[in-house]
Amino acid sequence: MDRMEIDDQAGIDFVTESINSERARNRWSTSHIPSLSEINPSSFQSPSPSPFASSTSLASKPARYSKPLGLFVLDTNFLLSHLSLCQNLIEFLTARCPRLVVVLPWTVLQELDGLKSESSSTCGYLARQAHNFLLQCFRSNVSSLRGQKVHEHCSSTEKGDDAILDCCIYYQEEKLIPAVLLSDDKNLSIKAAVHHIQSLSFSKGLEAASIVQTSFPSAFSSNSENLENLSMDIDLTVSQPLATATNHRNQGASTVDIPMDRTHDNSIWASRYAHFPPYDKKKDTTRSAADYIPYTYTALTKEEILHASHPRACKLLDQITKIMVEETAFLLSRHLLKLWGDYDLAMTKLLASPQFPPQNINDVGHELYIHWYTCFDGYLPAQERSNLKSKAELWNEWMLWAERGIGIGPKNQEELQTYVTFWSNIWTLLSRREILGDQASTYIGFREQNIEKWVERSGRERILS
């Protein structure tokens, strides 16, 4: 199909200025439109053959998860003006550099949706052209293209080019994945440079290979990595947390471990698989930091996992539970410290609940339900709060099934992966850079290392056997 391509500076400036003008009018500020990365590709009627149909099934073979080495973040003006170059870049990454990914910011998806309805304008035609191409890509499950999800941001209030910049900052600072902005907007490129985000604009002769070579030269030496040789190991390796709650009364002179409530049943079985107790405010107790001892979730031993009913799932579920139990206590203390500004007051609020610090996944669900708006307001829709306890209960049932063969497990691998993603997102939002302060870089590295393991393992064959 013939495409309109814009490669002269006057045309590029026209597209960029047109989009900036519409952004200034706030025309496409509506939020929560469906992300292309979350739409079921089978629901589309392809308007024309996929541009990847002849690419020897490059996109049809699902790759095992591996954290990207880098991202290219597309601005709307770059996508509209240079669609063929964007297609070449995606094809190049799919074939040669599978650990580099092109990301469509949420705002770009919104702007495409708004622009494509403008039948009489040049930008409208370019938007429809780009929209059809993207639908074909997602229909083909192209692994080197994804959309920014609604929760993947540092600030929920940014709009227009600031939202695109926020997308770059989120991936580079919160996910520790280097991001390169592809944009013809000089002002946005300057903003990106201020935040140490690399940017590239179109120039005559620019090709996909040169974009990658300039941005990520090491990708060429690592693109031969064979991700298919990852094997299922029944080890108990879990990356250890590198951050603890700072005692602000002593200005960082010591650290405070979030302790176990002595009134809980201390047996491993009781704490690991406890159900939600009826919540009774009369049972709330006033406790202070001096009354606590550290609580550490007791993970299953290697021998226990090997003798479990479903060892692969058992290992994964237990490791995720250990992280969520231990890290939720620490992170909630940081959120409330930020809210109240006083360590003792924050701890008093947390410890009013008998389920704090949590000892099992249901305690985690209970505490996050209580403090939902403190932690997630503006990041997750409020209706997610009502599902939190049921998700924790179901996870708890899966743990019993995996270890003892009691009850039912996940319906299929897709359901397991959905829940792994859920807890990964909860942890990511709990441990935002602004909450962690000086410990952010170290802690985020620890978090991303673990999440990468979870997602990769949940996608392995025979995980539920």
Swiss-Prot record:
It is found in: Cytoplasm; Nucleus. Gene3D superfamilies: 5'-nuclease. Residues 70-190 form the PINc domain. One of its GO terms (molecular function) is RNA endonuclease activity. Pfam families: PIN_4. CDD domains: PIN_Swt1-like. Keywords: Cytoplasm, Nucleus, Transcription. One of its GO terms (biological process) is nuclear mRNA surveillance of mRNP export. GO terms for cellular component: cytosol; nucleus. Involved in transcription. PANTHER family: TRANSCRIPTIONAL PROTEIN SWT1. Belongs to the SWT1 family. This is Transcriptional protein swt1. It comes from Schizosaccharomyces pombe (strain 972 / ATCC 24843). The lineage of its organism: Eukaryota, Fungi, Dikarya, Ascomycota, Taphrinomycotina. The gene is swt1.
